[in-house]
C-alpha cells in the first residue's frame, strides 16, 4: 500500500485555495481534497476549515466502525464542517460567498466509501483504467441530465464552474456517498484544476508508468501546468498494489 498527496497553485492564481490530506489510523485510511472559493483569502480559509475539522475528527476516533457507522460519521463530520464555515461567515461578513468543495474516501479492510460535494472528483483505478465514482454538483451537469446540453457542449460551457452544492453555501452541506467495491487497484481524488487540464486517459497514462508514486503526482502537476495551469491543482492517490 503506497499513498501520496500533492498540491500546487498552478500558473495563474496568486493563492492556493485547495487543501489536501491522507491520514492513516490503524488499518483505516482517510483521503480528502477540498477546493475553496470566494476570492482573497476566503477560499483558502474555507477549504482549510473543512479539511482540518475532518482530519481532527478522524484522529480522535479509534475506528470509523462498520459501513453504516462510517456513513453516519462522514455525514455528521461534514455537516459540522459546513456549520463551522457558516459560523465564520457570520463573524466575518466580508467573507460572504466563501465555500469549498470536498471529495473524500474512507478505506478499511471491510469497505470503501467515496463522498463528494461540489466538483472535485473521486475515481477508482480498476483494470488499469480510471473510473469516476462521483457526480459533479454543477449547473452544466444538471443541464446534461435534463437533456438541454450534450456532454461535449458541457465541457466548454461558459458556466461550467457554477456549483449547485458546496460546503458553506447553505445550512445543510449534504454530501453524496458512494459504496464502492473493495477490489480496486487504487483511489484517486483531485480538484478540477487537474481534470480541466487533463482527461482521464492522460491521467491514467502517468499512473501506469513504472516510476515512484511521488514522481507520478509531480508529473501530473507538471503536465497540467504545461497546458495552462489555470487553477490550483490537488491530488490524493492511494495505490493498494504498490508495496
Question: What is each residue range found by the language model?
Answer:
Residues 1-243:
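PP2C/PPM-type serine/threonine phosphatase catalytic domain
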Amino acid at each position: 500500500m503506497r499513498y501520496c498527496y500533492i498540491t500546487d497553485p498552478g500558473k495563474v492564481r496568486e493563492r492556493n485555495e485547495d487543501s489536501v490530506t491522507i491520514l492513516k489510523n490503524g488499518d483505516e485510511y482517510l483521503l480528502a481534497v477540498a477546493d475553496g472559493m470566494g476570492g482573497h483569502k476566503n477560499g483558502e480559509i474555507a477549504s482549510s476549515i473543512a479539511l482540518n475539522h475532518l482530519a481532527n475528527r478522524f484522529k480522535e476516533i479509534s475506528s470509523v466502525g462498520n459501513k453504516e457507522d462510517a456513513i453516519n460519521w462522514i455525514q455528521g463530520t461534514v455537516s459540522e464542517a459546513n456549520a463551522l464555515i457558516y459560523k465564520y461567515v457570520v463573524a466575518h461578513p466580508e467573507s460572504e460567498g466563501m465555500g469549498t468543495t470536498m471529495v473524500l474516501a474512507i478505506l478499511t479492510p471491510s469497505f470503501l466509501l467515496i463522498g463528494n460535494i461540489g466538483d472535485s472528483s473521486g475515481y477508482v483505478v480498476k483494470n488499469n483504467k480510471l473510473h469516476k465514482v462521483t457526480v459533479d454538483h454543477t449547473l452544466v451537469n444538471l443541464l446534461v441530465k435534463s437533456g438541454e446540453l450534450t456532454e461535449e457542449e458541457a465541457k466548454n460551457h461558459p458556466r461550467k464552474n457554477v456549483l449547485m452544492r458546496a460546503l458553506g453555501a447553505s445550512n445543510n452541506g449534504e454530501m453524496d456517498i458512494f459504496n464502492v467495491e473493495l477490489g480496486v487497484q487504487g483511489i484517486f481524488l483531485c480538484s478540477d484544476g487537474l481534470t480541466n487540464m487533463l482527461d482521464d486517459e492522460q491521467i491514467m497514462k502517468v499512473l501506469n508508468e513504472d516510476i515512484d508514486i511521488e514522481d507520478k503526482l509531480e508529473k501530473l502537476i507538471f503536465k497540467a501546468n504545461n497546458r495552462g495551469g489555470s487553477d490550483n491543482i490537488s491530488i490524493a492517490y492511494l495505490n493498494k498494489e504498490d508495496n
